[in-house]
Regions:
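Active-site neighborhoods and metal-handling regions in enzymes and metal-associated proteins
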Residues: 1-391
C-alpha cells in the first residue's frame, strides 16, 4: 500500500511560490525558523523536522533555497530533507549551548550568497517571527548590521492556509486513524484507570495504523482538569462519575488533525449535561454556517452573541475555529477581530470549548471550507453524540 504523504515535487512548488511572494514584497530573502515542537514552517519547504536543534529555510527572491540546521544535523538533514543544499550554522544549535570548538560552521553570509541575496543593505523577511530564537536573530543582525529586517509571516499564512489535494489527503488519513484510536480509548475507559494509561492506548493505535507521531500531546482529562483549554494528561485516576475529555490526534507527514469529545463515565445530568449539550449545539451551528466567500469575523461575532443570548457568556473562552494543518493549531484563527475572507480549501478545526464551574467540555473536528458549506473529515461526533458509559 502506497504511503500517503507530500510528494517531493510539491516542496519545490512551495519554494517557487514563496520566492514570488518574497520578490513581490520587495524583499531579498525570507527566513523561516522552526523548533522541534513548532516545526511547521521549515518542514513545509524542506520536509525536515529538527530534533533538539533548530532548523530554518532561507528562500531568495531568485527562487533558490537552502536548508539551515545545527551542528549535529548535517547528515540527518541530507537524508530526510527535500532541499539539496544544506548548511550547518552554529546559531541553530541546541539549548544546551555546546561550544563545538572543533566545528568550522557555515555562516549566514554564505547562505545568503547562495540564494542570491548579496551585499550589505539587504531586505530580509522573517516568515516565522515567533519561532525565531535570539541566537538566530542576533546572528542575522551581527552578519548584516545594515539590513532591514521585517516580519513577513503573512507570506506563510497565504501559502499554508489553502491546502493542496495532497495536504487534504494527509489530513483525511489522520482523521481515519484518530477515529480508530478514539474507539479503542472509549472501549478501555473504566473507573480506576489513569489519564496517562488511556493516552497509552491511543498511542498504540495510532502507531499501529500508520501515524508517524501524535498530532498533539494527546488529551485525556478528567473532572476538574477538563476546565483546561490546553493542558497535559496526568497520573490522575478516573472515577466512575467523572466527565472525561478526549482530544486525540495522529500526525501524517506533518499534518496533525484531532477529534475532541466529552465522555461521561456514568450518566449526564444537571449542569454538566446542560453545558455539554449547549456546547454541541454551538459546534453544530458553527459547522452548518461556514462557507467560502463570507468574512471570517461573521461566525465568531454571531457565535459570541449566541453565548450571551443563552446566558452562557461567562462560560465563553474563545471563538469557534482555528486553522489546522502541519500544526494542529495554526493560522489563521477565526476571531471577532479577523479581517480576511473564507476561501475554498482553507482547513479549520471547529473547536468548541465551554468552561463550567468545576469542569469543561470540547467538541472538535476538522473541516475544509467549500463553496456552499464545508467538507467534514470525520462524522465521529455525529455518529456517537453524547457518550454515557453507565458505570
Amino acid at each position: 500500500m502506497q504511503r500517503i504523504c507530500i510528494p517531493d515535487y510539491e516542496y519545490q512548488e512551495r519554494i517557487a511560490k514563496a520566492a514570488k511572494l518574497v520578490a513581490a514584497k520587495g524583499l531579498d530573502a525570507m527566513l523561516v525558523v522552526s523548533t522541534e515542537s513548532d516545526y511547521a514552517n521549515a518542514r513545509y519547504f524542506s520536509g525536515f523536522w529538527p530534533l533538539f536543534e533548530r532548523a530554518g529555510v532561507l528562500i531568495g527572491a531568485s527562487g533558490k533555497a537552502v536548508l539551515l540546521v545545527g551542528p549535529e544535523s548535517a547528515i540527518f538533514a541530507k537524508d530526510f530533507g527535500k532541499i539539496d543544499k544544506v548548511m550547518v550554522l552554529k546559531e541553530f544549535r541546541e539549548s544546551a549551548d555546546p561550544a563545538y570548538p572543533e566545528l568550522v560552521p557555515d555562516t549566514f553570509k554564505m547562505a545568503f550568497d547562495y540564494v542570491g541575496a548579496t551585499g550589505e543593505n539587504l531586505k530580509i523577511g522573517l516568515g516565522s517571527y515567533v519561532e525565531c530564537t535570539l541566537p538566530i536573530m542576533e546572528g542575522l543582525k551581527d552578519t548584516f548590521p545594515k539590513a532591514e529586517i521585517s516580519i513577513c509571516s503573512d507570506i506563510m499564512v497565504a501559502l499554508r492556509s489553502i491546502k493542496s489535494e495532497n495536504e487534504l489527503a494527509c489530513i483525511r488519513e489522520g482523521f481515519r486513524i484518530v477515529e480508530l484510536a478514539t474507539d479503542e480509548v472509549v472501549k478501555a475507559l473504566k473507573p480506576g484507570v489513569t489519564e496517562l494509561q488511556m493516552v497509552g492506548v491511543a498511542q498504540r493505535v495510532i502507531y499501529e495504523n500508520g501515524a508517524e507521531y501524535e498530532g498533539l500531546p494527546m488529551y485525556v482529562f478528567s473532572e476538574s482538569s477538563t476546565r483546561h483549554a490546553i493542558s497535559r494528561s496526568t497520573y490522575k485516576v478516573i472515577g466512575k462519575n467523572d466527565i472525561v475529555q478526549l482530544n486525540l490526534s495522529a500526525k501524517i507527514d506533518g499534518y496533525s488533525p484531532a477529534i475532541g469529545l466529552p465522555v461521561f463515565m456514568g450518566k449526564a445530568e444537571g449542569e454538566k449535561k446542560e453545558i455539554v449539550e449547549f456546547c454541541l449545539k454551538m459546534h453544530n451551528w458553527t459547522t452548518e454556517n461556514l462557507k467560502a466567500g463570507i468574512p471570517a469575523d461573521r461566525i465568531p461575532k454571531q457565535f459570541l452573541q449566541m453565548f450571551k443570548d443563552a446566558g452562557y457568556e461567562k462560560n465563553y473562552v474563545y471563538g469557534p475555529c482555528h486553522g489546522t494543518g502541519m500544526i494542529e493549531v495554526e493560522a489563521p484563527w477565526m476571531e471577532t477581530s479577523s479581517d480576511y475572507m473564507l476561501k475554498e480549501n482553507m482547513t479549520f478545526q471547529v473547536d468548541t470549548f465551554v468552561s463550567g464551574s468545576t469542569f469543561g467540555c470540547r467538541w472538535e473536528k476538522g473541516i475544509a471550507i467549500k463553496e456552499n458549506g464545508v467538507e467534514s473529515y470525520t462524522d465521529y461526533l455525529e455518529k456517537h453524540g453524547l457518550i454515557e458509559l453507565g458505570f
